[in-house]
């Protein structure tokens, strides 16, 4: 019999083992779709971003008008820009749901996969931040000023670090140029990290909703999960195009319709919605360095999750107390997101502080205690 090229060719063999003949658990639910959805998001963002970069000028005097020109005069430029801007929001929706799934089903016990995933999240956040600065509107400029300024809280080297990042004594042309270069580079870094993430995942195989070994009951990835993924793509791309076509500015800030002006500060400086939870944690601490540390901790705490797992069962499927705690955490994050979008005044200050304390308490204290308690209840 002639050899099957799909299984013998060095390159096709890798693709075959990752996407076609990959043994997958038969019972993985729709929550396992978000990995492939993130892949589609990344591909869409790179393609639309490349097309936008062809018409963009990374210069403070021209950036704003070059974006306006893209929307007015380039064939379908408005659509490409709207898909790119809202695609970022969908990217974050997918990654947050993906992390939530991993947390709920104990996928973090694959430590290497989880850690590369957290690094991917950090890289994505950096990419989104530098990208937000590029249209050079008011919120772009002031967002860049405020967030980069946080590095000045680092003792001894802080101020030097900020001036080095800015390329001067304020956010100006050198800053915009380097941010554009970084925004172009980072997505390819994300693509590289994704292959590492998948390599680690395929070492151990996928987890499943029961959290038990599924070696005795595996099915090929194709056609079952390829079809399921295509359904997922449709269900994500439909709301994305709907948003981009019907209300493209829904998630944006009206301040960004005004060109950047270093002499006028917007009344409320706030980042895009997907950073608001971390921004609320940053604002809830009255000390600058303390706020920066809390901001960093709010995301870096994910690295600790595998070490805080005390339960004998992997997933939360059969652990109702942990489930309750999990949904309290989700609600808490939604409260933080809402508080981050509000002005710094009573009652938002105290709500933000309480929600920040609750966030860290749930993750660092309540989850390990609950898991130990559940072990006792189940006579483990």
From Swiss-Prot:
Cited PANTHER family: CYTOCHROME B (PTHR19271:SF16)
Name recorded for this polypeptide: Cytochrome b
Gene (UniProt): MT-CYB
Topology of this chain in the membrane: Multi-pass membrane protein
Keywords for the protein's UniProt record, in alphabetical order: Electron transport, Heme, Iron, Membrane, Metal-binding, Mitochondrion, Mitochondrion inner membrane, Respiratory chain, Transmembrane, Transmembrane helix, Transport, Ubiquinone
One Gene Ontology biological process: mitochondrial electron transport, ubiquinol to cytochrome c
Cofactor comment text: Binds 2 heme b groups non-covalently.
GO annotations of cellular component type: mitochondrial inner membrane; respiratory chain complex III
């Amino acid at each position: 019999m002639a050899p099957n090229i799909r299984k013998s060719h060095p390159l096709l063999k890798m693709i075959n083992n990752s996407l076609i003949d990959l043994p997958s658990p038969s019972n993985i639910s729709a929550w396992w779709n978000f990995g492939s959805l993130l892949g589609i998001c990344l591909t869409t963002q790179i393609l639309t971003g490349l097309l936008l970069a062809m018409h963009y000028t990374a210069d403070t005097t021209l950036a704003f008008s070059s974006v306006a020109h893209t929307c007015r005069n380039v064939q379908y430029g408005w659509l490409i820009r709207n898909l790119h801007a809202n695609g970022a929001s969908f990217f974050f929706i997918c990654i947050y749901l993906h992390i939530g799934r991993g947390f709920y089903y104990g996928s973090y016990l694959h430590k290497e996969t989880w850690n590369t995933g957290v690094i991917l999240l950090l890289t994505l956040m950096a990419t989104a931040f530098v990208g937000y600065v590029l249209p050079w509107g008011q919120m772009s400029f002031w967002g860049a000023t405020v967030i980069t300024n946080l590095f000045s809280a680092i003792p001894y080297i802080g101020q030097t670090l900020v001036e080095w990042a800015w390329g001067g004594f304020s956010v100006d042309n050198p800053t915009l140029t380097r941010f554009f270069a970084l925004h172009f580079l980072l997505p390819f870094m994300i693509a590289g990290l994704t292959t590492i993430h998948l390599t680690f995942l395929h070492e151990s195989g996928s987890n499943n909703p029961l959290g038990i070994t599924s070696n005795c009951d595996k099915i090929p990835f194709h056609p079952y999960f390829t079809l399921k993924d295509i359904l997922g793509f449709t269900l994500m791309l439909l709301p994305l195009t709907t948003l981009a076509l019907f209300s493209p500015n829904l998630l944006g800030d009206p301040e960004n319709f005004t060109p950047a002006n270093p002499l006028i500060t917007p009344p409320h400086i706030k980042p895009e919605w997907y950073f608001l939870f971390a921004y609320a944690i940053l604002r809830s601490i009255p000390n600058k360095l303390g706020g920066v540390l809390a901001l960093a901790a709010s995301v870096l705490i994910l690295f600790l999750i595998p070490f805080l797992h005390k339960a004998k069962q992997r997933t939360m499927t059969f652990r109702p107390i942990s489930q309750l705690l999990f949904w309290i955490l989700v609600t808490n994050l939604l409260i933080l997101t809402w508080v981050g979008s509000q002005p710094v005044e009573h009652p938002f200050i105290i709500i933000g502080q309480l929600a920040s304390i609750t966030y860290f308490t749930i993750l660092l204290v309540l989850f390990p205690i609950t898991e130990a308690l559940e072990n006792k209840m189940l006579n483990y």
